[in-house]
Design a protein with these regions (language model features):
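Conserved alpha-helical segments that form or flank metal/cofactor-binding pockets of metalloenzymes
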Residues: 68, 74-117
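Disorder-to-helix initiation segments
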Residues: 34-56, 134
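A structural signal for well-ordered alpha-helices, especially hydrophobic packing surfaces
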Residues: 57, 64, 71, 90, ...
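Acidic/histidine-rich alpha-helical segments that form the ligand environment
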Residues: 102, 116-174
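Alpha-helical coiled-coil oligomerization motifs
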Residues: 105, 112, 157-160, 191, ...
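Helix-loop segments that flank and shape redox-cofactor active sites
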Residues: 40-48, 63-88, 151-167
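Acidic, low-complexity proline/glycine-rich segments
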Residues: 6-39
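Short, contiguous alpha-helical
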Residues: 95, 169-201
């Protein structure tokens, strides 16, 4: 004759449905590891794409933060125009960040997403905590774009060679054209042209 084991009673005062808030886990995929997906690409090609994309991701996050810093700190006669322009550019860069991160995950990689990891990885020069002149702010922004563009162009050549056409399309259509447009828009504010042409004024006035 078999006997049934009585169900274990819960400890007095224990509530069901309580979230387990102190859970921790070992890494199930390290930053260096890449999941194998049926993409029709070699392991080397995927690894090179992920490494390149993570560099662009870190630099893009840094560029976004730089834009927001300058959006808040900008001052002077062109404050309103630049305040809006810098925020518009920041939103565009923010949109590109999600595209880059998702592309890394699509390739089986791990995104570089935490601020301290981004700070270690970015190639963009760190700005001062304080406020720079408007021209210095804008020149710094153009140089930050140049850093990102350099890696994007290298990535375009790399992905073309490796036949990673999906990533190649993102780099060219989704990123390069946006950065080139933003460089043009910002750099035009660095042209040394006075707001008023004093040479056209009438003498004696």
């Amino acid at each position: 004759m078999t006997t049934k084991t009585a169900p274990t009673q819960k400890s007095a005062g224990m509530m069901e449905g309580q979230p387990h808030l102190k859970q921790r886990s070992r890494e199930i995929q390290t930053f260096q590891q890449i999941r194998s997906l049926p993409l029709g690409l070699s392991e080397q090609a995927v690894g090179q794409s992920v490494t390149m994309l993570n560099q662009i991701l870190a630099d893009s996050i840094t560029l976004y933060d730089l834009y927001k810093k300058q959006h808040w700190q900008i001052a002077g006669p062109t404050f309103y125009q630049l305040h809006l322009l810098l925020d518009t550019h920041a939103e565009e860069v923010e949109g590109s960040i999600d595209l880059i991160a998702e592309r890394i995950q699509m390739r089986g990689g791990v995104t570089c997403g935490m601020p301290f990891d981004v700070a270690e990885k970015t190639k963009i020069e760190r700005p001062p905590m304080g406020v720079e002149s408007v021209s210095a702010m804008l020149a710094r922004t153009v140089n930050a774009h140049a850093t990102v563009i350099r890696t994007i162009r290298e990535g375009i050549e790399l992905t073309e060679h490796n036949k990673d056409y999906g990533t190649n399309d993102l780099l060219m259509s989704g990123l390069l054209r946006m950065h080139e447009m933003q460089v043009w828009m910002i750099s035009q504010h660095l042209v040394d042209t006075p707001l008023i042409d004093e040479g056209n004024g009438r003498k004696g006035e």
